[in-house]
Amino acid sequence: LGLCLAAPRKSVRWCTISPAEAAKCAKFQRNMKKVRGPSVSCIRKTSSFECIQAIAANKADAVTLDGGLVYEAGLHPYKLRPVAAEVYQTRGKPQTRYYAVAVVKKGSGFQLNQLQGVKSCHTGLGRSAGWNIPIGTLRPYLNWTGPPEPLQKAVANFFSASCVPCADGKQYPNLCRLCAGTEADKCACSSQEPYFGYSGAFKCLENGAGDVAFVKDSTVFENLPDEADRDKYELLCPDNTRKPVDAFKECHLARVPSHAVVARSVDGREDLIWRLLHRAQEEFGRNKSSAFQLFKSTPENKDLLFKDSALGFVRIPSQIDSGLYLGANYLTATQNLRETAAEVAARRERVVWCAVGPEEERKCKQWSDVSNRKVACASASTTEECIALVLKGEADALNLDGGFIYVAGKCGLVPVLAENQKSQNSNAPDCVHRPPEGYLAVAVVRKSDADLTWNSLSGKKSCHTGVGRTAAWNIPMGLLFNQTGSCKFDKFFSQSCAPGADPQSSLCALCVGNNENENKCMPNSEERYYGYTGAFRCLAEKAGDVAFVKDVTVLQNTDGKNSEPWAKDLKQEDFELLCLDGTRKPVAEAESCHLARAPNHAVVSQSDRAQHLKKVLFLQQDQFGGNGPDCPGKFCLFKSETKNLLFNDNTECLAELQGKTTYEQYLGSEYVTSITNLRRCSSSPLLEACAFLRA
């Protein structure tokens, strides 16, 4: 008996919110038994919110929620996460999301930040694409102090006239002024109002009643099958530009995700839930069985357990939590409708920097203090976790190596400013307007290891700044991959320190962790052999035979330039560079002996935050940059005792990108191609997550 009680429950406890759902769930349970699939049991509650609480308390396992509730469920103390998304059919392509867009007629001449006083068309009050997203996005421009003042009143005063079906037309006649229904049907919450829903809101624009329609990406295509007709319309983008209607992936107010099944983020039984859903859709999905249909409800009750319009489910990669699933624009728009005007304005003005590891966090806090809180800090223990915080809108920016600019770019972030180093050219333009020259990736060895060349590295011990970074991973490993065709880098070198690799593997064997020998192989400065200085230290302390760093690393840490005990007696002449032709040269001759030229590190952010971020960073570097009045007195942005915290210590300034504003343009096609090839060797959980989110 004891054994039976200890056996894990093999049944998924599905949470229901009404008698009709409970009845469908019971049918679901019986039919899964018949096909001997994973078993499901039914838990009765009276609302989605009660279900969220029950799942968090381990009294139920799963429930399907819409985007707004996925947001609630992800918050503390529930911390649920989406594990499977419903898939819908849109224009022949199965989708797990749609995009909320603002459609206008070509030539109407205004941008998203100039909508005050125009006429607006909405799908309906309280709907995602037609109300919550656009009004949340326009919140900073509304004259609304926030709850408890009615939002409808502020919107009625913002647009010159609108059609917002379901609005309170008696109290706010302006919100129903453009609607076309007659008498009681004017502004009705159904298709009795001709301008209701997606197609209705578009018709309101098409007929010339309104100037802008807030709809979804497929609306224009469904209503105008002819491309020539579609060409008369454009989308308004968050960066206050316009784009063609088919560019909705680059130009939308928010991505609205489909309904998702949520579970606990710890011990959530998600494998079992997925087995149940996968089998259920195979047996009882669209056009499968007449006995029971998973995506069919009763005529009186729609969308029981799942949406009736769903085609099936896809599994959500485990890296994705509710914030990543919903995305920054959606989260910001939602937050904007819950906060006071002062809170919204403060959040927009502030720049939240993401610090990687405790040492960067300390420097960031100092920066925040001296900036009068114009800069605030978020922190994470790895660079990829920081990129995820920017994707969720919990941070605005961080400075990245080229390898991570690639990851961030694949996730939809853009480069904003690049680090620039002192130029050799004395009559070059000022730092901010000088094109960043990039830096040289080099392989450094001890002069005393005279027999070691680029061609005899196999079986040696290697030191790397971190996995996925440019100079120490993507460039040398890309070259080795091209030579050997093998991804087994742990077999090529006998031992390595490559922070960010599997701590149990030989790629972490040489790593040492912090002074307490903890956090070994962590990709942040807790690992003493992390970053350019750390990888060189790994060579200098004779742990490794070769260090992959950049051209200035040896120069910055020898001949007394670094006063730390391990570096103070090192001499530049005791180290040499390996050239790709099998020869060696002094470290000062990197120009003619390097592995590749690498793009400079650059600051990335969401595209709609880029202009504001630039403005703030230029002011900050004017004050705390190398030539600023407050460096070294109060704080130096580009100094950190040779640790390269937040920025590289040899940065002269953050510079304009010379028009290279996408990750592909900034990194250059050669580097992008080499990383794409190298990525076949390793999977990054964040890249997998972003591939799912941007599919």
Swiss-Prot record:
InterPro entries: Transferrin, Transferrin-like_dom, Transferrin_Fe_BS. GO terms for cellular component: early endosome; extracellular space; plasma membrane; recycling endosome; specific granule. Its EC number is 3.4.21.-. Fe(3+) 1 binds at residues 66, 98, 198, 259. The active site is at residues 79, 265. Belongs to the transferrin family. This is Lactotransferrin. It comes from Equus caballus (Horse).
